Amino acid sequence: QNYEISAGGKGLRVTTARLTDIFLEEAERGASCIELVTPGHYTRQIREALLSAKAQGLKLPVVYNSNAYELPETLRMLDGLVDIFLPDLKYFDSRLGEKYSGVSKYFEYASEAIRTMFAMTGPARLGDDGLLKRGMIIRHLVLPWQWRDSCRCLDWIHETFGDDVFVSVMNQYMPIYKACLHPEINRPLTTLEYQKVIRHADEIGITKGFMQVGKTAEAKFIPNFNGDHV
């Protein structure tokens, strides 16, 4: 859904000083957090901007939103600066990562990265307002024909972290961009496929979880990447 910025090269040049200002401006607008989306390739600049913003009074929780295909040493550069991690666990079978995402050893890298994230934040902790203030929400998008792999992802999450993390099981897959190159996923997810995964989450005892209801796989939910406030 985000191919426009992830593969299309769309974006704006921003200096580290301007990024610091953006963080502070978002706080002034009443944002509940600072969310960094797929930020790994700008880690050094983000670290510098966060240090500067926090020195100028930034108090908002910082959220690191990632596909989890990351190196632990990169993540540790932000130790003490990130409060919440939102990693995806896309595949248990790394062959699916090679096929659909063009990356090798996806699960090996992602699982180690997610462990590192947990070590940096510890168990999930909610504030008095009911919002997550520290910890991790691990997200998983169920793909057509891959509900068994989804169940294996949930098994690993629950066996590794128990109730110390939140889990979000998503049904919002949309067959766009290069999905046409893979006929088996060039269709929406069925309700039955999604229900099988949700049922499995319940059976293995996941209690801190989110599920999606209604029609979420629609174009209206794709953000307008127009660079507002940048």
List where the protein language model places each region.
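Conserved glycine-rich "GG(E/T)P / GGGxP" loop and the immediately following alpha-helix
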Residues: A27-S52, G97-K99, K105-Y106, R115, ...
